[in-house]
Amino acid sequence: MVTVEEVRKAQRAEGPATILAIGTATPANCVDQSTYPDYYFRITNSDHMTDLKQKFQRMCDKSMITKRYMHLTEEILKENPSFCEYMAPSLDARQDIVVVEVPKLGKEAAQSAIKEWGQPKSKITHVIFCTTSGVDMPGADYQLTKLLGLRPSVKRLMMYQQGCFAGGTVLRVAKDLAENNKAARVLVVCSEITVVTFRGPNETHLDSLVGQALFGDGAAAIIVGSDPTPAEKPLFQLVSAAQTLAPDSCGAIDGHLREVGLTFHLLKDVPSIVSNNIEKCLSEAFNPLGISDWNSIFWIAHPGGPAILDQVEDKLGLKPEKLRATRHVLSEYGNMSSACVLFILDEMRKASSNDGLGTTGEGLEWGVLFGFGPGLTIETVVLHSVPA
């Protein structure tokens, strides 16, 4: 008779969860940040709000973003004038777009990751789909499974309405799935488009304007599995993962799905909340490894905005090059919510290879990935690089 312990042992992988491939995708429509204020106030029929437009121009100028990608073109916005008002009932029209476009953009990223992985898609055992856009049943996980032609027995997990910390969440969940299911190969997709959050300006809701200045569209996909085969090429090992709520941070970042779409609220002290709590998260994650020099590890931090990055850098005494990959992705794409940290992983491993550095993590062995978002929730993932 087989024991439960023997069954459990046979079910589990031996090695750590490992990222085996990364793919990204963006909509074709690219917007220039320097001219975006003129476009945004024109398309929302708000040019008469001259003072507010000047504030928005300053927000865009300080954002450190050069361009973003957006599904919403001028043509789509003209067809849906309710999107351009500040608080017009518009959820039905927004939903009609996102339930189609979120899985479609996710499919592009997934196909890129699967191509790099180089294995038949029939080997995918699990799917995790994460989006802050467009709740539906069956969900985007189902739509993606159909679009890619995955096996009907693939085990799916749909994560809606998580927000900007969720790039860390999906890695934490994928790690548990890969390590507890022998031969599991987990396809993780984060697909985010701003169709639900786009709205016209209002003088009483400046934090909404901050979102209009920062958010962009993008999808990222990774393949995660333990015990890589000789045909697979490991990129990063997922060593540990933790989630915590920052103390005294209730209401710091909120999103509410209403008839008018997804409304966004952000307190001014978010950068200080993050920077005041980040060292505790680092210490808890790296003390077991005997690491306390935060410049000795590579960094992947969700780029919520330049103020968060500046305060984290200052609080921890980080050298400017530590957040190079993070700032590069913010500059080239804006804040893509959950997808951002996966874009940064992709940027880091490519730059490390191009620069001839010894590992996928800028030549360093250990690294950290941070997600920050509603709650205020902080996700901390310890990464181990592999030889480049």
UniProtKB/Swiss-Prot annotation:
Keywords assigned: Acyltransferase, Flavonoid biosynthesis, Transferase
Coiled coil ranges: none
One Pfam family, short name: Chal_sti_synt_C
Involved pathway(s): Secondary metabolite biosynthesis; flavonoid biosynthesis
Residues the record marks as active site: C164
Any one of the GO BP annotations: flavonoid biosynthetic process
Domain of life of the native organism: Eukaryota
Tagged with keyword Transferase: yes
InterPro entries per UniProt: Chalcone/stilbene_synt_C, Chalcone/stilbene_synt_N, Chalcone/stilbene_synthase_AS, Polyketide_synthase_type-III, Thiolase-like
EC number: 2.3.1.74
GO function terms (MF aspect): naringenin-chalcone synthase activity
Family of this protein: Belongs to the thiolase-like superfamily. Chalcone/stilbene synthases family.
Function: The primary product of this enzyme is 4,2',4',6'-tetrahydroxychalcone (also termed naringenin-chalcone or chalcone) which can under specific conditions spontaneously isomerize into naringenin.
Protein name: Chalcone synthase D
Source organism (scientific name): Ipomoea nil
Gene: CHSD
